[in-house]
Amino acid sequence: MHVPASLQQSSSSSSSCTEEENKHHMGIDVIIKVTKQDQTPTNDKICQSVTEITESESDPDPEVESEDDSTSVEDVDPPTTYYSIIGGGLRMNFGFTKCPQIKSISESADGNTVNARLSSVSPGQGKDSPAITREEALAMIKDCEVSIDIRCSEEEKDSDIKTHPVLGSNISHKKVSYEDIIGSTIVDTKCVKNLEFSVRIGDMCKESSELEVKDGFKYVDGSASEGATDDTSLIDSTKLKACV
């Protein structure tokens, strides 16, 4: 029996790049460099903990029962997945809504600088990656929103660094068009002096300029600017250690 293409499952998971013409393994790459305030005590204990929570902003209230026991689809916001990374004297909270999946989280610290990277993992590295259609990929680029909230942390527990290498997204880092991906950005200036933050979304298997976008945010010496970071030179990725 031939199943019409429209009814076939659009998100097939695969551990290697798909051969299909209209399918794309979309990934996201988030790089952040935080310079702490001069008087902040040095803390090089990276990857102290990583917490992941997924929540929908409008979870239906269990006390209120609808007449036919069904929840209207229109009422439910897309779920947001939050990652809270504690290390280097900071608690970095990242929120992702309608974005590619994060499968790799890493950190490094050098003096008063703490770097972090959250990314998808390209197929062929032992992690499944869904293949989606071009239309779904274009919608993801338009809809994906990343929020960030950086607080001071006095956590003292030891680093929990994983021994495996840091896996990456394999998204090409050429100049691409800007898209408004970064949503709210909150920093605690008690411990954060400067912040540079870059986000890229793209096809992890083939270069496709229409499916590759980036956004950036800079907070330096008390003033904020958007879209200004050159993510290729932002941090030394070879120094990163895997937190998950």
From Swiss-Prot:
SUPFAM superfamilies: Soluble secreted chemokine inhibitor, VCCI. Induction: Expressed in the early phase of the viral replicative cycle. Residues 37-53 have a biased composition (Polar residues). One of its GO terms (cellular component) is host cell cytoplasm. Pfam families: Orthopox_35kD. Keywords: Early protein, Host cytoplasm. Residues 1-79 are annotated as: Disordered. Gene3D superfamilies: Major secreted virus protein. The keyword Ligase does not apply. InterPro entries: Chemkine-bd_vir (IPR009173), Orthopox_35kDa (IPR003184), Pox_vCCI-like_sf (IPR036540). The keyword Transferase does not apply. Residues 54-77 have a biased composition (Acidic residues). It is found in: Host cytoplasm. It comes from the Viruses. Belongs to the orthopoxvirus OPG001 family. The protein is truncated in this vaccinal strain and presumably inactive, because the lack of signal peptide prevents the protein of being secreted. In the other strains inhibits host immune defense by binding to host chemokines. Binds host CC chemokines (beta chemokines) such as RANTES with high affinity, but not CXC or C chemokines (alpha and gamma chemokines). This is Inactive chemokine-binding protein. It comes from Vaccinia virus (strain Copenhagen).
